[in-house]
């Protein structure tokens, strides 16, 4: 991790943890609610819902009532004029989204600055050691700005000053402490860390190997198995865990062979879409489904009967189509695999190597890929910790405590473990935390848009909105729309999960996948190419949900 970003991430994660813990001790009842509840726009002055939402504490609230019978455009225009903070907060969010699309260009600029700096030092006669340790600040700054996981957290700083300017510090503090819930980012950090350990990944590899065995363990069979079974497992082990395992297996089985750009983006796009819809077999594993399950009384039977089987069929069709398109590349990667097998870490020649005979990085890489067997009881304990985390997904004290015990167990069994990489999970958690902060201020415009549409336009709109806002936020806002028809409820959830692979921010597990696979793309994952890679499976999923 770049030195300039290290403290930023550490303080950010500590802030998320502390605000979530602090929020459990109480609330604030004597101040005006922030952000303005939707009831303050839609309910009459003095009504029960109006009073219950605390609207009577808002200054000039009599000017907030939406125009009766107004169009969506008129309602949004009125809400901006009544509370101009709405527009400013959404503009900051828009800038943050545009920043994510520019991240790979900023990273490329950082590399260029670094290379030019190194060339100047070489020309001045500097040694390799001096060049290695003299990192230009400008390059580090551009690296930092090019980290996708940093973007939303960084723009929270702008939101902080704007909120203080419009209101005061206490308003922002109360919003962070009492209104926002950071359980999901903390859960993702823990589940990613556990799911990426060697025993869990090897177990998943063996499990998926049973399916790949039907195709003779060929590269094509592995690809199909990972992208079919892992996303559907997300309905039971949660989507972030499924994403982590699938991305790690894809990295080891395919991306390390440096496939073509088309194959790389098609595969990551397909992975994001499949994981987004694959969690719909149950009512507790996918964040967008979890948001509506209790308010709308959707249980596991309802989800499997109305969404799950359609998602499974859509995944099968999408995989088959991409398999046909890229079938020529599987044979090529299979030949590369045969060549690499001759240099396996477990051969006697390689096993005699010591860290001093090769670079530390190369030794660590070879050690991480060793095939020595893992005792069954170690794998079992890992799976128990994974199950504990999933079972207690909504209780941070429980799963964080479990994580601490887990780290202790890993140190006791270090011989069978690889290095615990917490950088990726922490950055993903930071990304999601920032998205939660910005997303909480977008209800003023998203809810009227969702509530004004018929079923088909609603599904399409939910799909599009999901690309620029977390799909769980979209479905949560749908629960706030009064008297939403059953067909509309289905449409908004179908649209939200369908569009979950279009961008990194569309679905909570996506940053986890990008964190693992991003290093295989030059200057990081290009948002436009990711969108194109995910577009075809998104259309297929949409048709399955609309027609079947």
Which residues does each PLM region occupy?
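Intrinsically disordered, low-complexity non-transmembrane regions of multi-pass membrane transporters
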Residues: 21-82, 106-151, 209, 213, ...
């Amino acid at each position: 991790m770049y030195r300039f970003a290290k403290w930023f991430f550490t303080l950010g994660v500590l802030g998320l943890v502390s605000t979530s813990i602090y929020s459990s001790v109480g609330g604030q009842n004597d101040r005006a609610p922030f952000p303005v509840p939707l009831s303050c726009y839609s309910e009459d002055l003095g009504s029960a819902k109006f009073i219950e939402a605390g609207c009577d504490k808002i200054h000039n609230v009599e000017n907030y009532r939406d125009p009766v019978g107004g169009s969506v455009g008129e309602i949004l225009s009125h809400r901006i004029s009544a509370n101009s903070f709405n527009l400013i907060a959404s503009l900051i969010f828009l800038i943050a989204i545009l920043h994510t699309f520019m991240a790979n260009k900023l990273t490329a600029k950082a590399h260029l600055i670094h290379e030019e700096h190194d060339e100047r030092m070489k020309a001045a006669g500097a040694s390799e050691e001096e060049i290695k340790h003299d990192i230009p600040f400008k390059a580090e700054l551009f690296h930092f700005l090019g980290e996708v996981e940093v973007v939303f957290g960084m723009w929270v700083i702008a939101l902080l000053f704007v909120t203080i300017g419009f209101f005061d510090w206490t308003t922002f503090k109360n919003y962070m402490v009492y209104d926002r819930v950071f359980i999901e980012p903390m859960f993702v950090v823990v589940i990613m860390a556990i799911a990426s350990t060697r025993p869990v990944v090897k177990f998943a590899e063996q499990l998926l190997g049973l399916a790949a065995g039907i195709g003779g363990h060929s590269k094509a069979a592995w690809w199909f198995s990972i992208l079919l079974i892992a996303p559907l497992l997300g309905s039971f082990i949660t989507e972030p865990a499924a994403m982590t395992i699938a991305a790690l297996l894809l990295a080891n089985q395919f991306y390390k062979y440096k496939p073509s750009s088309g194959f790389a983006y098609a595969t990551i796009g397909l992975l994001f879409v499949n994981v987004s819809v694959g969690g719909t077999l149950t009512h507790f594993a996918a964040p967008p489904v979890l948001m509506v399950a209790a308010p709308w009384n959707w249980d596991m039977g309802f989800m499997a009967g109305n969404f799950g089987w359609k998602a499974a069929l859509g995944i099968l069709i999408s995989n088959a189509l991409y398999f046909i398109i890229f079938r020529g590349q599987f044979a090529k990667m299979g030949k590369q695999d045969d060549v690499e097998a001759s240099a396996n870490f477990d051969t006697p020649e390689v096993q005699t190597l010591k860290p001093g005979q090769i670079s530390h990085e190369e030794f660590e890489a070879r050690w991480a890929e060793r095939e020595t067997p893992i005792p069954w009881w170690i794998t079992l304990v890992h799976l128990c910790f994974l199950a504990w985390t999933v079972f207690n997904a909504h209780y941070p004290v429980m799963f964080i405590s479990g994580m601490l015990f887990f780290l202790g167990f890993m140190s006791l069994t270090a011989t069978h473990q690889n290095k615990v990489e917490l950088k990726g999970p922490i950055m993903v958690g930071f990304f999601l935390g920032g998205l939660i902060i910005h997303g909480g201020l977008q209800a003023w415009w998203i809810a009227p848009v969702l509530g004004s549409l018929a079923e088909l336009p609603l599904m399409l709109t939910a799909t599009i909105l999901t690309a620029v806002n977390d799909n769980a936020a979209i479905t949560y806002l749908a629960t706030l729309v009064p008297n939403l028809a059953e067909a509309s409820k289905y449409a908004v959830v179908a649209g939200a999960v369908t569009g979950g692979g279009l961008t990194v921010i569309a679905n909570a597990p996506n940053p986890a996948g990008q964190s693992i696979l991003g290093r295989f793309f030059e200057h990081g994952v290009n948002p436009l190419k990711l969108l194109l890679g995910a577009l075809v499976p998104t259309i297929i999923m949409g048709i399955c949900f609309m027609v079947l």
